[in-house]
């Protein structure tokens, strides 16, 4: 599926403001970007899993054991962040399928190509995101 999308999009294609916003080619471009990102995360996670399985369970030296446990904790937190990112990628792919990708979930306005290229899982315009973060900060400070 990814190879078919790559062929239809083209190797050097980058979405442009000169095109119709979220036309079929742009949607395919972002679908390709998201699928490649998801694959790279899966590949990295497999390496992490292998490291955890290969790592010594019982280090004879207490310092070595503490170091291994710290490394494991970091690996597991990284995997948790990756799991959450994959959920965001899957959500973005569903929005593409539903015809909602590229539009702010709060205002319905276009998110913008530059923002989506930088952060393909973005669900809000910069302005809506900033307002959301301000509200979160205020509620945390209370």
Predicted regions span which residues?
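Short cysteine-rich clusters marking metal-coordination/redox-active sites
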Residues: 104-108, 125
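Interaction interfaces in information-processing and related assembly proteins
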Residues: 1-98, 135-136, 141-142
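Cys/His-coordinated zinc-binding microdomains
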Residues: 34, 108, 129
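Short Cys/His-rich "knuckle" micro-motifs
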Residues: 114-118
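Residues immediately within or flanking Cys/His clusters that coordinate Zn2+
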Residues: 101, 122
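Zinc-coordinating Cys/His ligand positions in small cysteine/histidine-rich zinc-finger domains
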Residues: 112, 125-128
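Short flexible coil/turn linkers enriched for glycine and charged/polar residues
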Residues: 98-100, 110
